[in-house]
């Protein structure tokens, strides 16, 4: 990667790493024409402050979400000993599924949350998985919209502002991008890079 940047001293480069420590170490090895960053640092600078300020707020617990969203116990069928039996998913468990669905959506290249982003337990009956996804979808959509609402006073994770940045289809400010450890990238990161129109992207790994 250093040789690539050395061969193009007149062009602005961007080295993208998965964490700040790797980016900081890389910055000491590249010349000044290469900026070393993480996806999150690029996103943090671009997303409205009202959203990133929510990183400092306390996160909503599953029990709070269950009560706030008025989630009720659901009786479904699960596989036990080679046959299906009735099983009750309690509100706090449903709330965790909702929160996890938003997190899963944030790691994808999808434009908007969908029922399929809810990852139901594999031991549920297939028909019940489908009905559970559809049943909880309004809660998933609400949780996402509240997460990106600067006026909603609840904490968020770093995945929220990264996803919001990705949805804006950002242009990375460089002539070329060096993406290290590309084999570990999720669909969100790859989606951002694939949409770069005027920037050469070099994948490594």
Give the ranges of each region predicted by the language model.
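P-loop NTPase Walker
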Residues: 1-54
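Alpha-helix C-terminal capping segments
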Residues: 4-9, 23-31, 66, 161, ...
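A structure-centric signal for secondary-structure junctions around beta-strands
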Residues: 10-12, 59-60, 173, 198
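Short, flexible active-site loop motifs that bind/organize anionic cofactors or intermediates
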Residues: 13, 32, 66-67, 151
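Non-catalytic, well-ordered alpha-helical scaffold segments
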Residues: 20, 37-44, 92-100, 130, ...
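Short alpha-helical interface patches
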Residues: 39-47, 117-128, 161-164, 190-192
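ATP-hydrolysis module of ASCE/P-loop NTPase motor domains
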Residues: 52-143
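Conserved helicase NTPase motor core
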Residues: 132-205
């Amino acid at each position: 990667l250093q040789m690539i940047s050395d061969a193009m001293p007149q062009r602005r480069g961007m080295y993208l790493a998965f964490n700040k420590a790797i980016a900081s170490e890389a910055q000491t090895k590249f010349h000044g024409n290469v900026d070393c960053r993480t996806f999150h640092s690029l996103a943090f600078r671009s997303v409205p402050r009202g959203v990133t300020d929510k990183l400092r707020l306390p996160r909503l617990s599953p029990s709070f979400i269950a009560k706030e969203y008025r989630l009720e116990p659901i009786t479904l069928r699960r596989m036990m000993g080679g046959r299906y039996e009735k099983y009750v998913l309690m509100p706090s468990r449903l709330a965790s599924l909702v929160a996890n669905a938003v997190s899963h959506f944030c790691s994808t290249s999808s434009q908007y949350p969908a029922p399929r982003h809810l990852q139901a337990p594999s031991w549920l009956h297939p028909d019940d998985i489908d009905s559970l996804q559809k049943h909880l979808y309004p809660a998933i959509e609400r949780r996402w919209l509240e997460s990106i609402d600067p006026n909603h006073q609840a904490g968020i994770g770093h995945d929220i502002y990264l996803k919001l940045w990705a949805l804006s289809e950002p242009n990375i400010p460089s002539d070329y991008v060096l993406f290290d450890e590309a084999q570990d990238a999720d669909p969100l990161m790859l989606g951002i890079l694939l949409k770069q129109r005027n920037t050469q992207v070099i994948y490594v790994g």
